[in-house]
């Protein structure tokens, strides 16, 4: 069964010119990029995207980071796309939880600057795709 998921290549990855590397890893896994858009994220979209973290102490710095520079947003499709992207990205903490061979394990050092976001469930993917790509 084909699934869709949202991938965000965050400002730290864009600044470090890692877009091609990350997209390449997704495509080499056998997934398809169905939509791709480089955009500057406003506070409203960022707040909606990270609404589940609103009561957490890091919410303000999370919004500040995701709005600090351009983000490459992508709809990724393929069999088990949500789980496949989560496997590719690795754990949220790039040093302690992300395995070598994952995007974060290979390319990131800090939890806040962990390069990439992937939806954590099919329900989250549907909600996030509707936010980031409302016309699709």
From Swiss-Prot:
Major location, coarse class? Answer: cytoplasm
The organism sits in which domain of life? Answer: Bacteria
Give the matching InterPro entries. Answer: NDK-like_dom (IPR034907), NDK-like_dom_sf (IPR036850), Nucleoside_diP_kinase (IPR001564)
Which residues are responsible for catalysis? 117 (pros-phosphohistidine intermediate)
Any GO MF annotation of the entry: nucleoside diphosphate kinase activity
* Presence of the UniProt keyword Phosphoprotein in the record: yes
**Binding residue positions for ATP:** 10, 58, 86, 92, 104, 114
**Record keywords:** ATP-binding, Cytoplasm, Kinase, Magnesium, Metal-binding, Nucleotide metabolism, Nucleotide-binding, Phosphoprotein, Transferase
Look up the record and name the cofactor or cofactors this protein needs.
Answer: Mg(2+)
The GO annotation for biological process reads: CTP biosynthetic process; GTP biosynthetic process; UTP biosynthetic process
Q: Recorded E.C. number(s)?
A: 2.7.4.6
Disulphide-bridged cysteine pairs = none
Q: Which GO terms describe its cellular component?
A: cytoplasm
Coiled-coil ranges per UniProt: none
Give compartment(s).
Answer: Cytoplasm
Its recorded reaction(s) are: a 2'-deoxyribonucleoside 5'-diphosphate + ATP = a 2'-deoxyribonucleoside 5'-triphosphate + ADP; a ribonucleoside 5'-diphosphate + ATP = a ribonucleoside 5'-triphosphate + ADP
Q: Tell me the subunit arrangement.
A: Homotetramer.
> What biological function has been recorded for the protein in this entry?
Major role in the synthesis of nucleoside triphosphates other than ATP. The ATP gamma phosphate is transferred to the NDP beta phosphate via a ping-pong mechanism, using a phosphorylated active-site intermediate.
The similarity annotation says:
Belongs to the NDK family.
Question: Under what name is this protein listed?
Answer: Nucleoside diphosphate kinase
């Amino acid at each position: 069964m084909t699934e869709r998921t949202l991938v965000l290549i965050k400002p730290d990855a864009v600044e470090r010119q890692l877009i091609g590397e990350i997209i390449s890893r997704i495509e080499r896994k056998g997934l398809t990029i169905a939509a791709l858009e480089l955009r500057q994220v406003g506070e409203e979209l960022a707040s909606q995207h990270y609404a589940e973290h609103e009561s957490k102490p890091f919410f303000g710095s999370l919004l500040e980071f995701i709005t600090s520079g351009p983000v490459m947003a992508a709809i990724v499709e393929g069999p088990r796309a949500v789980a496949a992207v989560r496997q590719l990205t690795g754990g949220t903490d790039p040093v302690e939880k992300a395995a070598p061979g994952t995007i974060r394990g290979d390319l990131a050092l800090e939890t806040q600057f962990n390069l990439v976001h992937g939806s954590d469930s099919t329900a989250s993917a549907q909600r996030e795709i509707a936010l980031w790509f409302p016309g699709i």
